[in-house]
Each structure stands twice: as C-alpha cells, then as structure tokens.
Amino acid sequence: MNVTRLYFRVAGTKQFARYVHKYAAYSSTSFQKKKSHFPSPATLDHPDAGEDAFINLRNENYILNAVFDGVGGWANVGIDPSIFSWGLVREIKKVFNNSDEFQPSPLTLLSKAYAALKKSNTVEAGSSTACLTLFNCGNGKLHSLNLGDSGFLILRNGAIHYASPAQVLQFNMPYQLAIYPRNYRSAENIGPKMGQATVHDLKDNDLVILATDGIFDNIEEKSILDIAGVVDFSSLSNVQKCLDDLAMRICRQAVLNSLDTKWESPFAKTAKSFGFKFQGGKVDDTTITCLLIKSKNYE
C-alpha cells in the first residue's frame, strides 16, 4: 500500500538554527490524524492533528518542543478530546512567551499552563498525556518532563542513548492531566509533578525525537534508528530539508504499520505482557517532532 505525501502535514521551523549561543537546533514536526487522507484546511486556528497537539517554540535562549495526546475516550460522552490538548498548547505558549519573568523548566511551564487552563473555563472536560523538552542553547542541556505514554528518544552515534519510560495506570490507560465535569468523581489526582523529569547533556548531531503513542505503538525503536541512520546531516545548508524528510518518513512508516493486521506491533507486545490478545498495528493519530542539535566551536 502506498501512502502519498499529501497524507502528511509537516511543520518545519526554518528559523530555529541560529548560532546565537554555542548550540543551534533544527526542528521539524510531521503528523497525520487517524481516518484522514487529506491535509487539513488552512483556515483552522491550529493544525488538525486529530486528538494530538504539539508545540515548536523558541526564544533567545531556549527551544521548547512538546507533544500531547488528547484521550479519545471523552468522545464517547460527546466531548472533543482535542479541545483539552490544544488548550494546554495555548496556555503553554502564553507562559513560555512570558518566561523572562522566571527560570523556565518543563515542569514550571506545564504546571502554570495546566492551572491556567483549569481557571479559564474554556474546557468542559478532557484529559491528555504530555511530553515536553526544553533545550538550553547556551549550555547544551535538555530538560524534559514526560507524563503518560507519549515520550521521547535521544539518538546518539547510531544508538538509543535514552528512551523515556511510559507511565501507565493499567493497560492502555496512561497517566494524564485532566479536567473532569463537576458531577464526575475521579479517584485519580494526577498533576504535572507526577511526570518524570530528566536532564541530559546533548552533543553535536544528537537527535531528539518526541512522539505520541501513535508513533511508538506502531514502530520499533530499531526501525527509527534505521530510518535516521541513512540521513546525512553533515551539510548545514541541507539540514532542515533532511530533518523534514526524516520526520515525515518515520510518521509515514508508523501509519503504514498501524494498518498492518498481521505483524506483532509494539502495542501488540505490550497488550500480551498485560495478558490481552492483540495482533497487528493500532490505528491512531500520529505526531512526531524531531530536534537536531548542532554545536559551533568559537575557539
């Protein structure tokens, strides 16, 4: 089965690569919503990534990337799951744009945004996973926060240097930030502080891949390594195009795998580990953001 380029939307942030500090970074995002075969309308106030949402932001000192997966179960009670995930994006953008007033961190950004979203009364109900990375262009440190079963990888020298672990309450029920209807009782009280925070010292040519579970449920880490391994990032004039193509290729492969009913997908393996029978891929919204680090020697 062939999947054409039109099935995918790519948001490449062409202006990310600026040698203001010791490090620069290039970023690109690719996504496809489930049961969709055409690009979303340009008139939307945000990209139509289904229940997923994402962020690519920068200022003079930091680069912020994040992915969110709105929990689809809310659709069963007539609530659009994307309203919550994109609501978080909206509030995080506000907080990040005012981050000169405080020392930013993924935990601070998400905590302030989540609190603001709850106070805004713009979301009746909903929930979402969250995975944020904040890259410091001055010292090369990547601060992260992952809550739920979205996540990120750090690829270095052709190997997985780090893979964030998933946080789940039970099978197919990830940790999630939520707003519940007033008449709804929830036993869970999950907040941003329950996410796993890490710090990593990044190096030249490190590749950071953030993705929702639509990616990780349908493509093995080794396959991601294989796809990334054939990309040549040595020429600065061609880096952005290569990164755009990489994000799209991984997204495309995950979507193709999700439609294969015969293979043992990562999701199928996880299901079996919990005692459930499942075969094939898992059709879902797929969102991936790639961040490539480049350093400059000022000696």
Curated annotation (Swiss-Prot):
GO MF term (any one): protein serine/threonine phosphatase activity
Location of the PPM-type phosphatase domain: 35-293
InterPro entries: PPM-type-like_dom_sf, PPM-type_phosphatase-like_dom, PPTC7
SMART domains in UniProt: PP2C_SIG, PP2Cc
Gene Ontology biological-process annotations: positive regulation of ubiquinone biosynthetic process
GO cellular component assignments: mitochondrion
Function: Confers azacytidine resistance in high copy.
Full protein name: 5-azacytidine resistance protein azr1
Annotated source species: Schizosaccharomyces pombe (strain 972 / ATCC 24843) (Fission yeast)
